[in-house]
Amino acid sequence: MRRLPIFLAFPLLAAAPPAAFVEHTIATDLRGGYQVVVADLNHDGKPDLIALASGMSELVWYENPGWQRHVLAAGQSHMINCVVIGNEIVLASEFSNEAKNSIGLVSVLRPGPDPLQPWTATEIDRLPTSHRLRVADLFGDGHPVVVNAALTGPSATAPDYRDQTPLVYYRPGEWKRRVISTENSGVVHGIFITDSNCILTASFTGIHRFCASKAGAFERTEIAKGDPAPWPKSGSSDITVGHLGKTRFLATIEPWHGNQVAVYTEKNSKWEREVIDDSLLDGHTIQTADFNRDGNDEIVAGFRGQPHSVYLYSFDSAAKRWVRSDLDNGGMGAAACAIADLNGDGRPDVACIGANRLKWYENR
């Protein structure tokens, strides 16, 4: 492993000027803000924001452009993740880190004639510690499914959480649980759906890729082991994919709720790990996008501990190093961020949620 220094100096040496962001606070009354999802819920062509807060009984959304608040579902408990697929929303709730205390309720929300009114929830499954929901066209047939990654196995207990951790999916309409794999073990905190319709998982045992074969079975491949520290401080926590020009890289938070931002680049069929920052406290979200349109993706990483910040990492092509700047310094203990063009100007923006706040960082 090679550690890269963190440079906080300005300006960046890249040919294109760095992106500039304007901060907009959308909400300050959330409790336990955990996930933000971008979706056009009222079908007006403008992306709206779903704000999932684990300490609230209501799943709410904010209507673009004025960010008027609406309730999607009431009477919820310990919500942890949701995903939009077609005209439906799949919601995971009744969550606990301890499997024995986690119901792992999975429900489908459906709108009535007026999508601005609360949607109707129907239970489809109970999988303890259901934690990460994502949409993926796993079989490449144009029929996406919902992937559900549990946090731990059903018998796992703190602090080691040793057990086989289920990864499953549901076909819309049928909504029957189908198993992808139980090969991962320990905490599986993050997943990412690749352009090739595969699943990347970040867990105590590192980074793994799951791809469906033509026969429908799933093949598991180890990409990297993540943080080499002993279990349970080992492995990876969150993962995303970015590009520097045409070269692909992986970006991770490591270990679980960890302090490190790591970048993996592929050389000679092996993924080399570089820690570009080790100062995070309770790292919890990582994303990539080309914010300044120079052909290189930047990395967005947020953490929930002090000083409650979101960092932006840009690659300095001349110096061959990552340079850190502040997207939010002290005002956002980010549990999750999402990237989308929220104002229709063609530039990717950032939305982050954490604690009581939901913010939009407008890329100008």
Predicted regions: what they are:
Residues 15-364:
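Beta-propeller-forming repeat regions
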Residues 5-14:
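Bacterial N-terminal signal peptides
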